[in-house]
Amino acid sequence: MDTMFDTLLQLPLLQGLAPEDFTSILEKVKLHFVKLKAGETIARANTPCNELIFLLNGEVSATTTSSDGIYSLTEFAQAPYLIEPQSLFGMRTDYTAKYVATTEVNSVRVSKTAVTGHLLKYEIFRLNYLNIASSQSQSLHSKL
């Protein structure tokens, strides 16, 4: 059985990070663990993305509504999953979808301040972040 430490190291943004570096991060960065029941909202569309939200377990639905409100698209994702890392920076820093737990979900949240002040100092974190944000952006573009 994995410990919480092992589980966190398996998250996509932290994969490849040396355990010593992760221990150093834990000393400086406050992690907010949140447990949600099925049906509870994790993040709302058109609200500021000011933290990274990692799903540790469970499943979520992501519903995106067209700008004219005529239609919406719902997709499902299972943990491990990072909610909209591309929305943390850039010109549009609001969530583009509404995220709702479809099962019980455990998540960990890290503030944007912690990301910019501590996590981006680690090359492996920067590379993982760029790869994940790029992959999600490319995936969204291919759906157009």
Please identify what each model-predicted range represents:
Residues 34-36, 77, 110:
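Hydrophobic residues at beta-strand termini and immediately following loops
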Residues 5-7, 98, 108:
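Short hydrophobic/aromatic segments of transmembrane alpha-helices and their interfaces
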Residues 1-33, 37-38, 82-83, 87-90, ...:
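Cyclic nucleotide-binding regulatory module and flanking cytosolic helices
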Residues 64-66, 87, 111, 119-122:
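Short, flexible helix/strand-to-coil boundary loops that buttress conserved ligand/catalytic motifs
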Residues 40-103:
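Cyclic nucleotide-binding regulatory domains
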Residues 22, 94-97, 113-144:
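A small-molecule sensor/coupling module
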Residues 104-114:
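A short hydrophobic beta-strand segment most commonly corresponding to one strand
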